[in-house]
Amino acid sequence: MSLNFLEFEKPIAELEAKVEALREISRRGDENALDLEKEIKQLEDKCLELKKKTFSDLGAWEVAQLARHPERPYVLDYIEHMFTEFDELAGDRAFADDKALVGGIARLDGRPVMVIGHQKGRGTKEKVIRNFGMPKPEGYRKAKRLMQMAERFNMPVITFIDTAGAYPGVGAEERGQSEAIAMNLKIMSELSVPVICNVVGEGGSGGALAIGVGDYVNMLQYSTYSVISPEGCASILWRDSDKAPQAAEAMGLVAPRLKELELIDTIIDEPLGGAHRDHKATAENIKQRLLEQLKELDAFDNEALLERRYQRLMSYGYC
């Protein structure tokens, strides 16, 4: 169970702490300890009801915090729980290997696929190595190389999006960050194999979109997808990052709103309390949806698949 509770989860944390304390007393088996099973059960039921109530009415700002939860599963966690025979491929064959973006060949239910996704890292050392999940141009060029390889070998491409955005450093700009992102948009719109994109945490701006063009775009229940962070939006509009909660509500960055606007296709349920509560269950939910969608896309020949993707992209926006 997660030890990191968000501010709005504090009442839940207090109840869970009480339950754990009573369990510890019960486990010790002290001669004077009362039979606590009934009290533990009552507290567990109360905690469950509180969770259901809390998570049934989350605002956009609370969802944004869940999307960034430090124990939320990342692409390597999904690879572990969903795929077999994963073989990571490194480098863009031009400059370097970007650890913020992971990719390689794996099997999904026995079927060869190309898996690509952002990896934020856990702990200070890994976060620095992974650049906090913010790819540089070489990361996106690595993704392009892997997607083109997938097309040559007729393998579907599956992406996992979870980034605050593309790295905005001077070196990244000098090496063509915007060109790398733009090229990926072009490549992904032209791939002759099925492409399924999954927003599993933060979907931040062009850094997310660079691996986000596909035949299906799915979002986890408590993920976000937007052109800027709520804090960034608040700083620009109101010169006050403390107004991030108001910005989050106005931006429409949550899955239900994006589904309503037909910018995404599917909302995938998370376990009660969020994906960080149960990595395996979350991965299983995504896996089942991927298998269903791949089966649907297999019915299209290359020409029909590209036409379907083109029509999907051209449907975006208002006329």
Swiss-Prot record:
Enzyme nomenclature, EC number: 2.1.3.15
Superkingdom classification of source: Bacteria
Main localization category: cytoplasm
GO MF entries: acetyl-CoA carboxylase activity; ATP binding; carboxyl- or carbamoyltransferase activity
Key word Lipid biosynthesis present: yes
Pfam family, one: ACCA
Any one cellular-component term (Gene Ontology): acetyl-CoA carboxylase complex
Cysteine pairings via disulfide bonds: none
One GO term (biological process): malonyl-CoA biosynthetic process
Domain CoA carboxyltransferase C-terminal as annotated: residue spans: 35-296
Pathway: Lipid metabolism; malonyl-CoA biosynthesis; malonyl-CoA from acetyl-CoA: step 1/1
Broadest EC class assigned to this enzyme: transferase
Record carries keyword Repeat: no
PROSITE patterns registered for this protein in UniProt: COA_CT_CTER
Location of the protein in the cell: Cytoplasm
Alphabetically ordered keywords of this record: ATP-binding, Cytoplasm, Fatty acid biosynthesis, Fatty acid metabolism, Lipid biosynthesis, Lipid metabolism, Nucleotide-binding, Transferase
Record's catalysed reaction(s): N(6)-carboxybiotinyl-L-lysyl-[protein] + acetyl-CoA = N(6)-biotinyl-L-lysyl-[protein] + malonyl-CoA
NCBIfam families named in the record: accA, AccA_sub, PRK05724.1
PANTHER family: ACETYL-COENZYME A CARBOXYLASE CARBOXYL TRANSFERASE SUBUNIT ALPHA, ACETYL-COENZYME A CARBOXYLASE CARBOXYL TRANSFERASE SUBUNIT ALPHA, CHLOROPLASTIC
Function: Component of the acetyl coenzyme A carboxylase (ACC) complex. First, biotin carboxylase catalyzes the carboxylation of biotin on its carrier protein (BCCP) and then the CO(2) group is transferred by the carboxyltransferase to acetyl-CoA to form malonyl-CoA.
Subunit details: Acetyl-CoA carboxylase is a heterohexamer composed of biotin carboxyl carrier protein (AccB), biotin carboxylase (AccC) and two subunits each of ACCase subunit alpha (AccA) and ACCase subunit beta (AccD).
Family under the similarity heading: Belongs to the AccA family.
Full protein name: Acetyl-coenzyme A carboxylase carboxyl transferase subunit alpha
